Every structure is written in C-alpha cells, then in structure tokens.
UniProtKB/Swiss-Prot annotation:
Provenance organism: Arabidopsis thaliana (Mouse-ear cress)
Annotated binding of ATP, by residue: A224, I225, K226, V227, F228, G229, K230, S231
Protein name: Ureide permease 4
Extracellular side: 1-10, 62-81, 126-141, 253-275, 340-344, 396-401
Chain ranges passing through the membrane: 11-31, 41-61, 82-102, 105-125, 142-162, 232-252, 276-296, 319-339, 345-365, 375-395
Originating gene: UPS4
Tissue distribution: Expressed in developing seedlings, flower filaments and stigma, and the top and bottom parts of carpels in siliques.
InterPro entries membership: UPS_plant, Ureide_permease
One GO CC annotation: membrane
Localization in the cell: Membrane
Amino acid sequence: MYVVESKAGAIGCMILSLCCLGSWPAILTLLERRGRLPQHTFLDFATANLLAAIVIAFSLGEIGKSTFLKPDFTTQLPQDNWPSVLLAVAGGVLLSIGNLATQYAFAFVGLSVTEVITASITVVIGTTLNYFLDNKINKAEILFPGVGCFLIAVFLGAAVHASNAADVKEKLKSLPSEDLYSSIENGEDKPEIEKTDVESQEKLAEKAKAGTAGFYVELENKRAIKVFGKSIMIGLFITLFAGISLSLFSPAFNLATNDQWSTLPKGVPKLVVYTAFFYFSIAGFLISLILNLIFLYRPMVGLARSSLKKYIYDSKGRGWAVFAGFLCGFGNGLQFMGGQAAGYAAADSVQALPLVSTFWGIVLFGEYRKSSKRTYALLVSMLAMFVAAVAILMASSGHRK
C-alpha cells in the first residue's frame, strides 16, 4: 500500500484536503438555492462519497509491497480486526450525520458562518482529543496557539455574521412594497407574485443584483428550504449539532487506525488507513441512505414531500451533487493519509476550511456584497486569522514513529 512517509508529503495531503473539503459545501448550497431538494442531493452525494473510498482502497491501498505490520487493503479485509472496524464505522456515522445536518444549516445560517461554527467546535473538541490520542506527537507550544488563533477567527466570524445580518435587514426595509416586505417578515407565500404575476417576477429578476433587497427576495422564491420568517434558533441548533458530530469522527478514526485502547487481539495488525476508510465510508453511506429515504417521505423544516421515484427521475443537478461527493470523499481520504503520518491533531488543520468556503460564498453567492465597511473590515480580519491558524497548526505536525 502507498504510505505517506515525509512531513512534506503529509502537509501536501492536508492542503489538498483543505481545498476539497472547503469546496463541496458550496456545491450543495448552490443546488439548494436552485431549488433541488436536499434529500435528493445528499443521496447522490453519499453514493459518490462511497465510490471515492472504493477507488482509494483498491488503488492506493494496493500499491507497493504488503508487510505484516502494513498489509495492503485486500490482505487485511478477512483479518480479525472488528474492534477497530467498529470504531471506523462509528466515525463514518458521525461524519455523515454531521454533513447531513450542515446541509440544512447552510440555508438558515449561511455557508460561511455554518462552516466557521462547526470548524470551531471541531478544533476545540476534536483536535484536543487527537493530541492526547496521538501521544502528544504534535508540538504543543505551536499546536495550541494555533487553536487559539482559530477561536479568535471564530469570534470574528460571528461578528461578521451579526454585522452582515444587520446590513441585510436594513436593505429589506428599503423595499418599495410594504406587502412584499410583510410576506418576508411572516414567511408567507404570495401567489400573486410568485405564480400569476409573471411580469412582476421578471422585473424583480432584472433588478436583483447580488447584495440588494431584490436579490434576497428572489433567492427565497427559488430555493428549496424557505427561511424567511423562521427562527434563527433552528439554524443555530442544527449547526451546533453538526459541529459536535463532526468533532468526534476524526478521533474515532484515529482510534481505529492506531488502537490506543489495545482492543485488537494479540498478533493482529492495526487497521491501515485504506481499510479503515473503506469501512468508515460504507457506514456513512448506509446511515445517509436510511435517513434520506425517511426524509423523502417525512421531510424536515417544511420541505416538500418526495418519493424514491421522484428522486430517481430528478436528474437536474445530479452531476454537481456527485462531484461534491467525490470532493468530500477524496478530501477525507487525504486528511486521514496526512494524519497517519503527521498526527491527526495537525491534520485537523483542514477544519480551517471556512477560509475556502468563505471564498466560494463571496464569488458564487455574492455574500457580503454591498455590505457596510464594518462588515468588510471584520471579514478581512477573519480571513487573515484563518490563514494564521492553518499555518500554525500545520507547523505543529510531528512524525509518527
């Protein structure tokens, strides 16, 4: 199997992983904003995620010479390593539930802020756990200041969200139609605007430039998850739940591949990254399949009811959802490969993915467009702190013996 031997190789894996894991949320957000049901999107996403793990296992997991301590993927499959397999399965379930929750949080809280909050929880809980599980192979004097920088960036991100929310509220007050603004406040549908008055809808679309009040109204009319009039606590609760789930999957994977609790029978080698990732991804796919099949018929947060037949025939946006799944799958694989070499605490530097997600949020969705100078100043400060956090966490990486 292919093994990352050098610190430089591990850091390279982390950088590539950061780009992949920071980009797929933008694709899911794009599809939801275009009106595709999140249940349909996540089924495609989860399938591609599993395929990525299979490709990695049967390619990188089979390269090179197989040894007793580092067997290749197919050699290890029949071995008696179920305690570690169950830990990998637990990690896959946690990641999948966390990703599923973030998909809904993106609509309520926004792409950038959702990623900031979930990443902060992951850094505080997950990175600290990984540091001790890895027998402190990372440099604490560098690692924890990096965590501190990340937390500062989190508070800056919260300030960005508050400032931008105030900007948006002020823009919506400028709408010329009091009735239209009332519908936004109460979350009510206006059939005369959305369905019958095509001319008014076209005029609104013509004026809807990113960052304007018309832009937010048009977005609400198109998107799958309606958010106007909904309590912000719904989104924050979903985001908090997602963050806790995501903070625990990496320590579970760490335990699966390094057996710190000595659960394996004597003489059985530890799970290699590729075998653990294979079981990890199968578990994630199965829990995603079960939950989203339920959500097709019993949808959450006021979504339209669907069916398996409707999902099969809903090909619009499927290619993008599959692409997002591959990005997530390969991103996770690269994170684990880098973590095996440099320590999972350092590999958790990929949780600075809000840096990438914020970039896509600005470029693709016009987030913070036409905002106040205060919002821009806070945004630049947050991004600068994220850059510092990534650099410091990567510099803390040690080398597993």
